[in-house]
Amino acid sequence: MSVGSVFNRLWARITHDRSIGFGLEHIGLTTLRYPRAIALAVLAFSILCFAYIPRANVDGDLMRVYAHSGQYYDAYEHLSDTFGTFENDIYVLVSSPRLTEPETLERVRELAFDLELNDYAVGTMSPFTLRKPDGLGNSVPAVPEGMDDFAEVAIALADLQQNDPMMRNLITPDLSGMVLIVFPNQEMTKGDGTKAMIASVRETIAYYADENISIELTGPPIWTSEMLAAAVNDQIKFTVWGFALGAVIALLALRSLPAALLVTATPLLAVMWSMGTVILFFGSFSFLTIIVTTLVLVISFAESMFFIFNWLAYWRDGMEPNKAVDATVKLVGPAAALTMLTTFVSFASLALTPGQGVREFAMAGAMGTFLLFVCLMTFMPLMLKAVIRLGFKPPRRSSLVLTAPLPLAWFIASRFGRPLSIAAIVVTILLLIPYGLIQPRFSFEDMLAKQSNALTTAEQIDDGVGGVAPLYIRVPLAGTDPNVDDTDFETIRRVHEILESHIGENKVISAANLSNYTETGFSREEVFDSVGPFMRKRFITDDGSQALVTGFMPTIISSATLKQLVQDVTTEMEAAGIVGAEIGGLRGLTTFGTDQIVSGLQLDLTLSVLVNLGLIGFAFQSFRVALASAIPNLFPVLGTEAWLYFTGQGLQLTTVLALTIAFGIAVDDTVHFLSHYLHSRREEGRTHMDAVKHTLDRIGGAIVATTIILCSGVVIVTFSELPQVALFGTLFVSTLAFAVIGDLFILPALLAAGGKFFQPLGRIRVRTADHDATPDDPTGDTITGTGGTEGHSQPG
């Protein structure tokens, strides 16, 4: 055989001598030919995945979402490594109306010392741990010990709160509350250590809380623990309710409990495979990858419903049930493979945006999509043939609810196809305007669990002494004096003043605060020695080359306000001749980093749309098919983004994720519709309009059923305790709801209106179904009957 001949055959395989599923449906054909071998493989892989499921856990590290996402994460990591930050600290708010009574003050002092001795703490900062020079080369407690008079305590605390820059951030102005900050041991808090640390701290404070003293915890570790608890609760809720709703809807649609259980079995196994694989590859779920199991669940339900509907229709057409299984694999398999590829592309496109969290979500989703297709092509045929042997009897008919919209859809398509098509095209083009104008928007509050007690406590601290959402400025110094020379001290003082002018008086701490002591005659070395090496590192590096200025902002601040603040502070520092200063912190990372990630994801969404439309056109070897699929699938995505734009919600992280994945899934129904339409034209010889009507009758009910299952399964997500996850569910459901309008009304109208334009589709060379011989179907018969969703005849 010549090289040219080999090349021609290879080229033909790539272009037209193949199915629309690029041959991936041969996984199903292999199952039909070698059922025992495939059954063993399915069993072995299931055992592997089941072995990993008991290890399932959710990683509460918020940094996993932003890790390696770009310059803002790198700056935060460098800042944390150089100085340590307050982002991992636990804030303890102690409140008492009798705080100025000596007995109460000493009890709070004991609490502060107990927290310092906690196994998980490497240090604390509180009014009791701060010390000041005594003028004799030693230091004494900033809050004097041994006071036994109410007035003496009140005068001492008031003096510290009003005159000591550090104490202003730890003692409330009305002297009714104090903030104690616990610095955790980062090595001990890795993995499940944070949960154990919080439990240990709660155990410590429980001894001191009574009717006189109220103690509450807040800070990033508490926030993430609440988010983690909400995420775990969500995972259980989504899985249980998703299965329950899917099964109930399948029961109502098929009007048969055994048939509903058949629809449910494949999604159950697909979710188990997906969970086991995520744990195998990533070790744990993140706040993003936990959504993947719900997506795999609902997509599996949708594909299972398509498979069961087609199988029952063949059976009702009079085909022998085992042969009907084979025929369904050959007809549905190529379309299912193509829908898997479009969803796979939607997930995979997200990996182009930097960030460990997004890339893990993309990889987990892509793997889950492929696994559910494999499950559909292996487990489903094996299960159906097994239940046939056990005497399964199909339901006599499906629910009339599923087919109720079909006569209206055909009436509109046949009578008003052209005006509806023109309107759909014009509206879709106009919706491109808000798509290009919409901007990222970030709200830190949306990341936290709803009704967060820790958030309420943080807001109380904001109102009292400062904030628990620090903004940091890393200031490069010219000298190398570990105790800071006069020139460098002036640089620190100037940055301190600039930041304080923007976030409020007494909301900033830095080495400049020490001037309160140096002005009374103490040297900087004496003052630095008195605060101790741990606190010293929060002000300046050991070699004196860098300083840290920390501003405590309100916990809840809009992203627009924060961006403007950073811009103004940067401009003023540059005007003051301070070069190389770097602003960072968790709030800066989540605000600017999220904007960067969201902008990248918006480009990924655009790329996903273009690639998927191109993939559909290439799969069918027809640009006409790509054009036919464009409007019904662009309309729901662009419509949802327009709603976000006009309501001022903007783009958020989960917004773009939801739209990208929803587009990939919405394309599924379109692919199944076009596949059946072209099968009717090419292989059954139907006319153009007859093929449109036959396709609408044959799979319209399945499209309605799958959309109901998809929306019902994901609507559970809208009740998540995490606002970002709830928003994901809301947008996902609304996009799919619009998509069913596109597939049942707009797509048939486009096909009907473009009769001459779509006429050549009857001559496409790629196969919409396979005709390979299998044991129960040696002739490769995939001709569909004329009885629509219900088939031509009732099986006995």
Where would I find each of the regions flagged by the language model?
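Hydrophobic alpha-helical segments
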Residues: 270, 274-390, 720
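Juxtamembrane segments of multi-pass membrane proteins
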Residues: 65, 71, 77-78, 82-85, ...
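Hydrophobic, glycine/alanine-rich multi-pass transmembrane helices and their short helix-loop junctions
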Residues: 249, 337-378, 613-617, 639-650, ...
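Interfacial segments of transmembrane alpha-helices in multi-pass membrane proteins
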Residues: 233-285, 352-356, 603-648, 719-720
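Hydrophobic transmembrane alpha-helices and their membrane-interface caps
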Residues: 259-307, 625-674, 742-745, 752, ...
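Signature of alpha-helical transmembrane segments and their immediate interfacial
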Residues: 5-60, 381-386, 390, 394-443, ...
